[in-house]
């Protein structure tokens, strides 16, 4: 019916006087094309979408088998002009029975665009792969567009680095390259690729075990450095591997749980089949609060679903030797325990078992992955001058940019590898955010016009040459032309991503040296853990968290702040008034961070991104968006240990339901609330500008209301 209607519109268009005038000058009509017209429903005629779509000046792209069927028994007739009045009548009555043609066609258009985009990306990726095989391996190239001032600083820093034999000292594990406070104990990541390549059978066996188990999902339970690299791998490679594309067998879908928010835990559980899921508990120390809570929760759930005898066979641990988790896993009969390397800190552990065991479980060819990383390892070794060393050069740029005020490292990445930004964010922010200094990583902030950015930005563009984003290319080119410093990292294809893991680890270590910091410690992370333990201890004694009084409450939304911030903000009679006063404190060179302790789903992220951009555009400053408690193991160190240039908006929510945890005296809701309030108290102790907004359990409605209040608050900014 729709086709007949469309064809009638088409014919009317080419019968107009306007078209006849064009035709008289040689214009030719564009033909209507009917695509994907094979019949998929066996209840229909195999020539249905050919028989019914015949008309003058049309094209029909049919599969070969459909064409053969039409030759054999198709019906040849000008069918598109038959029963046109009936088509109009049916279409006019659709709304009466609750069918919106606009909604249907809008949905089909959106779905079709995704399918064509995926097909095009797949074609380009195949071409890139063939090109890679023909050309052979190469190190991902980079280019620097820094502007005169920063370029001069980097050139001078490179000369000093080379004169001091900086690269050799790094590989020699010379702690004096940093602060001489034990840094040499945390450099095991320098040799991890070589060590991992020496045990290929380990990863083959991991993959074989998963296949043998017939698992549909692998659920990794972890936080921070133990979960972020697997999350990148899952988001980058998981869809193709779990779908079994390119004729390959299907692999389990790798999922990550790194939030104590009850709604997030519940949503994750709802997405899996407990009987077909392998659970991976990842924790270097083996004593981290969140993974242990996740582990006990799912041990209980699996035991109830399958029986206690089956539980151990469904769990794997990744942890350092001698940890509490190793002991627990041994006592409870876990299927396997994989050891980390004690000389590698969590955020530098991507290429150790913490990244590579989950990689093998989801079907990644770990041997090829590590071989790709090895190209960057060799390029970063001593021998070349600093600016010819891809990791050292990037690190010098990051460090010098931060020292001259360009401390907002703004990541831009082709959509296919966008998830690597969260891993870089943790690596760089947690390594450099201390002693009043920090490289503040801005990840996931959509690009704007060059004039919307201040002089505190450094842009790094991770571009996939195989499937680039044209809009990003134009925006980054405009930034360069406007004089903003830009570093370009040109990845051939998805297979080049392993190189970036090692490049950024080297770069972070070098940046720490330039900034005079120890990049391997995290002195301020423990403060939030202590505050959280104080909150949960209070709950164990009183069955409630310490009471607190809101500064303002209206329509289910309450505002909280510590005494110093409350005094600085004054008194207001509306949510927009409090927000206006809070963001009036933003100054040039500051950044705003939204810290949201809500379920990390697409709808919440969309709404929070809208609020984030509203703040950025109104105040012309850098913005960060983090979901709690995930960010506590990432940017939380920089927020507390870095300069007092952050303005924080914390968002917490009522929990529609809580989830009890076996062997714990409290559920996930209490943990999440204690983490939020504990971290806020530490930020307050550090004199940070902060405001907390607490909303009801209808988070979508609350975030929409918050955004409306923000719009009002920032209208005259």
Please place each PLM-identified region on the residue numbering.
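Extended, charge-enriched "interface" segments that sit outside catalytic cores
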Residues: 136-214, 466, 474, 488, ...
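C-terminal amphipathic alpha-helical interaction region
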Residues: 137-140, 521, 526, 543-547, ...
């Amino acid at each position: 019916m729709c086709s007949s209607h469309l064809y009638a519109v088409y014919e009317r268009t080419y019968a107009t006087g306007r078209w006849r005038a064009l035709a008289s000058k040689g214009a030719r009509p564009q033909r209507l094309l009917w695509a994907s017209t094979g019949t998929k429903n066996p209840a229909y005629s195999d020539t249905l979408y050919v028989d019914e779509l015949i008309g003058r000046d049309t094209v029909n792209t049919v599969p070969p088998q459909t064409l053969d069927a039409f030759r054999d028994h198709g019906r040849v007739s000008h069918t598109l002009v038959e029963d046109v009045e009936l088509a109009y009548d049916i279409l006019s009555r659709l709304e009466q029975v609750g069918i919106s043609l606009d909604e249907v066609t809008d949905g089909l258009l959106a779905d079709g665009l995704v399918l064509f985009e995926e097909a095009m990306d797949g074609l380009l990726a195949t071409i890139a792969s063939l090109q890679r095989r023909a050309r052979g391996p190469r190190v991902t190239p980079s280019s620097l567009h820094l502007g005169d001032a920063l370029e001069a600083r980097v050139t001078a820093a490179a000369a000093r680095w080379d004169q001091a034999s900086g690269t050799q000292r790094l590989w020699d594990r010379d702690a004096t390259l940093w602060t001489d406070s034990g840094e040499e104990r945390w450099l095991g990541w320098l040799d991890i690729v070589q060590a991992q390549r020496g045990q290929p059978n380990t990863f083959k066996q991991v993959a074989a075990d998963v296949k043998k188990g017939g698992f549909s999902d692998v659920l990794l339970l972890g936080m921070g450095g133990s979960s972020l690299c697997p999350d990148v791998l899952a988001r980058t490679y998981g869809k193709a591997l779990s779908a079994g594309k390119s004729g390959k067998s299907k692999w389990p879908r790798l999922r990550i749980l790194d939030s104590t928010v009850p709604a997030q835990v519940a949503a994750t559980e709802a997405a899996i089949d407990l009987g077909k899921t392998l659970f991976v508990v990842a924790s270097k120390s083996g004593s981290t609060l969140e993974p242990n809570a996740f582990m006990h929760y799912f041990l209980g759930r699996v035991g109830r679903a399958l029986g206690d005898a089956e539980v151990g066979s469904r769990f794997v641990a990744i942890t350092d030797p001698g940890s509490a988790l190793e002991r627990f896993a041994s006592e409870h009969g876990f299927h396997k325990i994989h050891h980390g390397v004690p000389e590698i800190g969590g955020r530098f552990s991507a290429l150790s078992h913490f990244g590579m065991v989950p990689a093998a479980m989801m079907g990644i060819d770990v041997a090829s992955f590590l071989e790709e990383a090895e190209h960057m390892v060799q390029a970063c070794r001593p021998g070349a001058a600093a600016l010819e060393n891809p990791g050292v050069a990037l690190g010098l740029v990051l460090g010098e940019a931060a020292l001259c005020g360009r401390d907002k490292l703004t990541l831009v990445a082709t959509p296919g590898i966008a998830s690597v930004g969260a891993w870089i964010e943790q690596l760089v922010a947690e390594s450099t955010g201390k002693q009043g200094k920090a490289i503040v990583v801005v990840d996931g902030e959509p690009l704007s016009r060059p004039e919307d950015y201040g002089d505190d930005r450094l842009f790094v563009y991770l571009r996939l040459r195989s499937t680039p984003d044209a809009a990003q290319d134009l925006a980054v080119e405009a930034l360069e032309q406007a004089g903003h410093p830009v570093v370009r990292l040109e990845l051939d294809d998805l297979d080049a991503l392993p190189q970036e893991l090692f490049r950024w680890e080297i770069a972070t270590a070098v940046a720490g040296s330039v900034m005079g910091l120890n990049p391997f410690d995290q002195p301020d992370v423990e403060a939030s853990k202590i505050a959280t333990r104080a909150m949960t201890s209070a709950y164990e004694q009183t069955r409630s968290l310490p009471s607190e009084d809101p500064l303002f409450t209206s329509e289910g939304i309450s505002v909280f702040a510590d005494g110093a911030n409350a005094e600085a903000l004054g008194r207001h009679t509306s949510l927009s008034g409090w927000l206006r006063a809070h963001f009036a404190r933003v100054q040039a060179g500051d950044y705003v961070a939204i810290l949201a302790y809500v379920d990390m789903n697409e709808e919440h992220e969309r709404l929070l991104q809208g609020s984030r951009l509203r703040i950025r555009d109104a105040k012309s400053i850098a913005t960060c968006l983090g979901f709690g408690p995930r960010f506590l193991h990432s940017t939380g160190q920089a927020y507390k240990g870095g300069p007092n240039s952050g303005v924080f908006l914390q968002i917490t929510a009522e929990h529609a339901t809580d989830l009890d945890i076996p062997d714990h005296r409290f559920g996930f809701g209490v943990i999440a609330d204690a983490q939020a309030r504990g971290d806020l108290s530490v930020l307050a102790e550090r004199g940070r500008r902060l405001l907390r907004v607490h909303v009801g359990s209808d988070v979508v409605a609350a975030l929409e209301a918050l955004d409306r209040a923000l719009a009002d608050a920032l209208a005259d900014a």
